[in-house]
Amino acid sequence: MIFPIRCFSCGNVISEVYDEYKTRLSNVESPEEILNDLGVTKYCCRRMFASHRLENGKELFDDIVEYR
């Protein structure tokens, strides 16, 4: 699934910090620390990052595209 532009609950724009989140996550930083530094404070917005699958720097979308 492609990362959403806005939080589903409150509507805040969250995609603007996603690239930095993804980069820092690959550098083995804690997700809690990253989101605090990026200013993502609402639980609903943090949920959007926590529930988005990232494995070895790849998203679920990257796996699905291979079977197109």
From Swiss-Prot:
Record GO terms (molecular function): DNA binding; DNA-directed RNA polymerase activity; zinc ion binding
Catalytic reaction(s) noted: RNA(n) + a ribonucleoside 5'-triphosphate = RNA(n+1) + diphosphate
GO biological process: DNA-templated transcription
EC number annotated for this UniProt entry: 2.7.7.6
Cellular compartments annotated: Cytoplasm
Binding site for Zn(2+): 7, 10, 44-45
Class of this enzyme: transferase
UniProt cross-references to Gene3D superfamilies, sorted A to Z: Homeodomain-like
Keywords attached to this entry: Cytoplasm, DNA-directed RNA polymerase, Metal-binding, Nucleotidyltransferase, Transcription, Transferase, Zinc
Record-level GO cellular component terms: cytoplasm; DNA-directed RNA polymerase complex
Entry's cofactor comment: Binds 1 zinc ion.
PROSITE patterns: RNA_POL_N_8KD (PS01112)
Cofactor: Zn(2+)
Family matches, as SUPFAM superfamilies: RNA polymerase subunit RPB10
InterPro entries xref list: RNA_pol_su_RPB10, RNA_pol_suN_Zn-BS, RPABC5/Rpb10
The protein's assembly and partners: Part of the RNA polymerase complex.
Family statement drawn from the similarity comment of this UniProt entry: Belongs to the archaeal Rpo10/eukaryotic RPB10 RNA polymerase subunit family.
The protein's name in its UniProt record: DNA-directed RNA polymerase subunit Rpo10
Source species: Methanococcus vannielii (strain ATCC 35089 / DSM 1224 / JCM 13029 / OCM 148 / SB)
